[in-house]
Amino acid sequence: MKIAIHNRPGSFSDRWIAYCKEKGIDYKIVNAYNSDIVDQVSDCDAFMFHHHHGDYRDVLFAKQLLYSLEEAGKKVFPDWRTCWHFDDKVGQKYLLEAAGLPMVQSYVFYTKEEALTWIEQTSFPKVFKLRGGAGSANVKLAHTANEARRFVNKAFGKGLSQFNRSGYFLERYNKWRNGNDTFMGVMKGFARLFLPTEYAKMHSREKGYVYFQDFIPNNSYDIRVIVIDGKAFAIKRIVRENDFRASGSGKILYARSELREDCVRCSFELEEKLKTQCVAIDFVFKDGKPLIVELSYAFAVAPYDKCVGYWTKDMQWHEGPFNPEAWIVDCLLA
């Protein structure tokens, strides 16, 4: 089998390429952004493309390209089942509800009138989210009905940008203050107050819907579990200081004793039901029981190098280092 790999430095592709070289797997580098990409992969049996939600080009075409090649008979990563809901919290709401999986209660409205009526009838606080964004970007707490109305008015007015300039700056500043970023990173965040990203310039504003989730109090951490081909590993993320969000905090615990096997079991159940090649699942807890917040097919590479082991589907623990990106290649070759 010959694999075509789109190479994006810093992504899964670094380790895919290294693993193919190490194991003597036939591969070629292709450029998914070229108009002739279908021709580029014509002599290959598989195509691998770690597309990113922060690149406007990927948002425009990556899922469509992958699905087209999959329909043409090629093996692809990520395949349609794995990635159609990527960076789409509204899509994930429908998917998890239809699959009967435990999730944080979520609400979506497509008219201002329906949203405002719901606000009058519900309790607060509620968590407001845009359908896209990672690392707690575009996630805010509506403490009161008035705050929720302001989000609704924006969503059905001029809309909201997926890139929050002030939020990005504060994110970098807080990470620097906690030792998780450099001063140069803070300066880059400051520059973004005046210079938007390429994505922000090219992507239209989010409008015409609002999405809320119940706020689950008393969570000092969340658990993220990643499942690839019947193997699972996990991390514990500590909630930010004076905040309710853990994603993107940079405060991570890896010891097996810090992790929760009930989340791992639920993750294996999700993998089985959704037939995904790779899925990262974020959990919070209500009355001691895990609830899914959201999903992703992708994850940052470096933070998981510190994981001390993984589980197999029989819930056996396997101590020691591992290479999840290599698992993805092996899954595609199987």
Where are these regions (language model features)?
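Extreme N-terminal starter segment of soluble prokaryotic enzymes
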Residues: 1-4
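Conserved N-proximal alpha/beta basic substrate-recognition cap immediately N-terminal to
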Residues: 8-117, 121-122
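Generic beta-strand structural signal
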Residues: 108, 227-228, 285
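Protein kinase-like catalytic core scaffold
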Residues: 126, 211, 233-234, 279, ...
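Phosphate-binding site of ATP-dependent enzymes
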Residues: 143-262, 266
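C-terminal active-site "lid" helix and adjoining low-complexity regulatory extension at the edge
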Residues: 253-258, 272-273, 285-334
